[in-house]
Amino acid sequence: MEARGKVVGVIGNLVTIEVVGTVSMNEIVFIKTGGRSLKAEIIRIRDGEVDAQVFEMTRGIAVGDDIEFTNKLLTVELGPGLLSQVYDGLQNPLPELAAQCGFFLERGLYLSALDRKKKWHFNATAKVGDIVVAGDFLGFVIEGTIKHKIMIPFDRRDSYSIVEIVSDGDYTIDDKIAVVENDAGGKHIITMSFHWPVKIPITNYKERLIPSEPMVTQTRIIDTFFPVAKGGTFCIPGPFGAGKTVLQQVTSRNADVDIVIIAACGERAGEVVETLKEFPELIDPRTGKSLMERTCIICNTSSMPVAAREASVYTAITIGEYYRQMGLDILLLADSTSRWAQAMREMSGRLEEIPGEEAFPAYLESVIASFYERAGIVVLNDGSFGSVTVGGSVSPAGGNFEEPVTQATLKVVGAFHGLTRERSDARKFPAINPLESWSKYRGVVEFGKTEYARDFLAKGNEINQMMKVVGEEGISNGDFLVYLKSELLDSCYLQQNSFDSVDAAVNPERQNYMFDMLYDILQSDFKFESKLEARGFINELRQNILDMNLTPFKEEKFNKLEVSLKNLVRSKKLDFRGA
């Protein structure tokens, strides 16, 4: 029986609907009000009534308004044309919305996610008679700098034989590309695009692997001390203004991935505007073209309805999984998952559910875990590899890492990059605290060496705390030297100048080279007559290494600075291993 319904109650963006007929959980409905149709999602079903969260402002909705049931889940359209686009959480292209509406977007306006008029040059790789299943490739089109594979839709459950496939040429996303037939004789027309529900993971692959290969970000403190693996997960918690968004932008520019997807879910409008303005101007170091050519942005600012924040996170991860199915490496950056969790808390309160810690819903941990678990590296049907790496920033109030969202995130991620107010106020970038952060993945530098360096940083911090109480004169020369060496490692290796063309991105070879040099200095034993002499010597080393950081690797100036550094160290200690 076809469902019929009317509005019987409205609380904020939660609408209660009286229903006659059969409905399903997470079904999309349209509320007819004032000549508009507002999209909503059913989130609770009770006897004769359902509750739906509306993705728009609910002003004007009245008791008795009619409901249109779609019998479909919230889906995204997948196909050529997703890259370089800016979408809202419901996959409406924002530039086209702005062209139609001006500065203030209208309610109830939903546009096609993909350009239906643009023609793509299709190159067939399959042929008539081939046996295919969901996720298999029929051919490809060139989208920006990547080969966008045209696939059998993921919802096809049978094995099919190709009975017809078009020749190479230009086609729109709605044109027939192929006709496939199953064993029962049922034929299906395949086009370049199809829809997929955002809350259901795409699982059309042979095998899921354990992430092991490092995803090189070219940020020293991450790659060396707290690495992220391709197909892994990481989080960047930190107080407001600590540099989370900037660190994510630097990562997206330099990371060793094919495609970057940014989900700005609930960030302040000013930060989202900054991202939208900066990204088209950024040059991709790999291609020399605009970074936007391999980027897709899904944005819902904190001023937009809360329900759309949740949608934007799921839309982004689904698009990431789609490109993973082509054998590509994807990086998804969610900024910020705290605002998504706050949206869940708001909706949970309206549903009158029993609250958990700090009024967050009791199911907060399982929802966050289900999102991060969609990351991973997989073996596809043709034997190639694809990965989705997920990084979420968390904005705990006051930088308190003990709050529920941070704790729920820490239980499921593989790396933790904790930013602190103390380091950001000291103008240290990245402001990642080397003593609180951790990673379960393998980095670009040998693990034993990095552990030795971290122990050195911990000792240096202990001595620094002691000096705040007893002063420099209250500690031995040996302890003071340990403190100076830890500061040398911090300033010359853990910090980076993102505005310098050389120091902004450091490849693994250079990271290993510079770390070995510093590692030898940490292990060397120096003798000084006074603390003043020790400080002067370490300051000379620091300036020399900082100059090397700003100089292109292995060029003449770099080599001269290296010789100068070795001579300086040799003057105080003969067994310097870099000599």
UniProtKB/Swiss-Prot annotation:
This is V-type ATP synthase alpha chain. Belongs to the ATPase alpha/beta chains family. It catalyses: ATP + H2O + 4 H(+)(in) = ADP + phosphate + 5 H(+)(out). It comes from Borrelia hermsii (strain HS1 / DAH). It comes from the Bacteria. GO terms for molecular function: ATP binding; proton-transporting ATP synthase activity, rotational mechanism; proton-transporting ATPase activity, rotational mechanism. InterPro entries: ATP-synt_VA_C, ATP-synth_a_Xtn, ATP_synth_asu-like_sf, ATPase_a/bsu_AS, ATPase_F1/V1/A1_a/bsu_N, ATPase_F1/V1/A1_a/bsu_nucl-bd, ATPase_F1/V1_b/a_C, P-loop_NTPase. Keywords: ATP synthesis, ATP-binding, Hydrogen ion transport, Ion transport, Nucleotide-binding, Translocase, Transport. Produces ATP from ADP in the presence of a proton gradient across the membrane. The V-type alpha chain is a catalytic subunit. PANTHER family: H(+)-TRANSPORTING TWO-SECTOR ATPASE, V-TYPE PROTON ATPASE CATALYTIC SUBUNIT A. Pfam families: ATP-synt_ab (PF00006), ATP-synt_ab_N (PF02874), ATP-synt_ab_Xtn (PF16886), ATP-synt_VA_C (PF22919). The keyword Transport applies. CDD domains: ATP-synt_F1_V1_A1_AB_FliI_N, ATP-synt_V_A-type_alpha_C, V_A-ATPase_A. Its EC number is 7.1.2.2. ATP binds at residues 238-245. GO terms for biological process: proton motive force-driven plasma membrane ATP synthesis.
